[in-house]
Amino acid sequence: MNMQETPGRTQPERTAAMRARLIEATLATLLDAGYSGTTLVSIAKTAGVTRGALNHHFESKDDLVVAAVSSLLTNTSSEIRSYAKSVQDGTLSLPGFLDRLWELFSGPFFMVTLEHLTASRHNPLLKTRLVLLTRDFHRALDETWSSFFTTKELQHPGLETVLNATLCLLRGMGVQTVLRDDPAYYKRLLAFWKDVLITHTGITHKAKERQR
């Protein structure tokens, strides 16, 4: 059912639905065509709407990109937070947590991230707007890391540093996937880092014990 066929919706609801539709189309276009290949015409086509309908909600390509990145970072932050909670309650081991993060950093989330990062290098206005969004994203990640400390069994003085180092590793691996399609190579790197995490935190064993 398209938007015109959906009865009983208020104007704010229709507006929110259209914006969500355009944001989803923007993310899909960035992933498929890259930032340079993303245009208002291509986004409208992907969304199945007219250019006029698009311009009613967003004035420029970068307005759409910023809105799309904001949505992407919010959803990803929520996803990572849910994984962290699973480690806390013992339903997910720390190596399992690393596997979940790698799925994010080797998939669409990170590929889209690469597009807006490289675009920002030569687009000062876009960079200024995205810096604010990424700052909020990293603040949310810091809150997620600190949540590990709320459970006594998971407290460790170097845990926050280890987890931030983990993100740096995954970002680097994610960039490398662009030119190196070698799953076995990345699997070895992940296995090595899982040993590092176990050595520095001991969380894996404690999580298993709570599952018994």
List each language-model region with its residue ranges.
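Helix-turn-helix
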Residues: R21, A25, T29-D63, A67
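N-terminal intrinsically disordered/low-complexity leader segments
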Residues: M1-A17, L179, T204-R212
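Amphipathic alpha-helical packing segments from all-alpha helical-bundle domains
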Residues: T76-Y83, E103-L114, P124-T150, T161, ...
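Short, basic, alpha-helical segments at the C-terminal edge of helix-turn-helix-like DNA-binding modules
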Residues: S70-T76
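Hydrophobic/aromatic-rich alpha-helical bundle segments in the mid-to-C-terminal region
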Residues: L125-V131, F148-R212
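Hydrophobic alpha-helical connector segments
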Residues: D63, A67, I80-F110, H156, ...
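Solvent-exposed, amphipathic alpha-helical segments
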Residues: R21, A25-D32, E79-Y83, V112, ...
